[in-house]
Amino acid sequence: MPKKTATKANPKEVSDSENDSVVSEEEDNVPVTKGGKNAKASKAKPKEVSESDNSGSEQSEESEDEAPKKGKVNAKKAPAKKAPVKKGKQDSDSDNEEDEASEDGSDDEEDVVSADDSDSDEAPKGKAAKKAPAKKAPAKKAPAKKAPAKKGKAKDEDDESEDEAPKKGKGKGKATKKDGDKPKKPLSDYQKFLSKRMPELREEEPGKPYKEYMKMAGAEWTEQNGGTKKKPAAKSGSKTAKKAPAKGGSKSTAKKAPAKKAPAKKAPAKKSKKEASDEESD
């Protein structure tokens, strides 16, 4: 019974072991002789041995190639139980093949696990990328530029602000009187003469400019009055008439004249020696 299970489990291994045993028996039966036919036979046998070895190596390579082809199912299965094998080279060959198969299976398992891990790592990343798109930062709105005001409107606004400024002041606008309320200065005789004579000259000589009428009226005034432009005397009751300062002057306005210093007395000039000698002689 154990022999049959061995042949079913690993038929290739049994065939390799049988070939090796046949080769070993033939080598033992060949007598060693010098030269001749026996020598040729001995030379031919190593070729057969090498061919059998090559066939065994090819079969082992095929078994190694078939092991990864079985896929994930064979790689995950538990290693097959070792069948009882004949003593000698069969044990070593079977052990080597099982070790190689187990190594190939472990490598395949590691590759499968690493591929699964890589797929599992990449899958959630893709989902996360789809679910959570990158939020765009809200673009800052540029402050709207104010359109430059037209020059005409700006001037009007400035004028209005200037007009409103005195109204908002602290009573200054009320205290100041308008120009119409101020008393007008009385016209001089020269101005009165011009106001009468100018329209007469326009009627006499129409079509001339205003300045020429002024010159003509001024020339007539100088001929009549000798070139003096007298102003009318101020009325007694007018507010604008200035009071004449009192004679003698007030104490505040009158300036005291500085007292004159007495002239310093001159020192008598020294007499010369000649005059002194003359007086003594007298």
Curated annotation (Swiss-Prot):
Keyword Cell division found: no
Chain intervals with Acidic residues compositional bias: 16-29, 93-121
Residue ranges, compositional bias (Basic and acidic residues): 176-187, 197-214
InterPro entries linked: HMG_box_dom, HMG_box_dom_sf
Keywords: DNA-binding
Residue spans of biased composition, Basic residues class: 70-87, 127-153, 253-273
DNA-binding stretch(es), residue numbering of this chain: 183-252
GO molecular function, one term: DNA binding
Organism superkingdom: Viruses
Keyword Ribosomal protein: no
Renumbered residue ranges of the record's region Disordered: 1-282
Official protein name in the record: HMG box-containing protein R545
Species of provenance: Acanthamoeba polyphaga mimivirus
